[in-house]
Amino acid sequence: MNFLSRIISPVVIFIISIQFIFAIPEAFVYNHSTEQAFYFFESVTIDGQVVDADDWVGVFNGDVCVGARRWGECYGTSCDVPVMGYDNSEYTTGYMMPGGMPSFKIFDASESEYLDAVASEDIPWFNGSYEILDNLQNAVSGCTDADACNYDDTAN
């Protein structure tokens, strides 16, 4: 093997392996659109703990993924998550329409688990908007009626 081959082979292997380290979770694959909005989250938590850099936030319109971002791409600060809208192309069928309400999921990479998530505010989607939200947290089911006998103060 010549000198150049000894250098190029490890570099190619490294580049290919990097693609798999940060591969987007299967359920979070989406197409880009000319119609876009961004939802910025100050924090994202699972059971009250800040998510890891390898965890992902996904945005959905029904069961169609319309955007996603790996938390580590934001370097521990507020994170922008792109949310794509329908732009009259076949690639964006089922994407957000003006006034539609997106839903969110968190992919916990350490557990390989998708979790339903609840944003601190419900903000409808509009093309070109930039929304800032305090928090996104995994959904904790339970009774949210403070006067009920089975009230769960951790439920959302």
Task: For every predicted segment, state its role.
Residues 2-156:
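Primarily marks secretory-pathway-exposed extracellular/lumenal segments that are disulfide-
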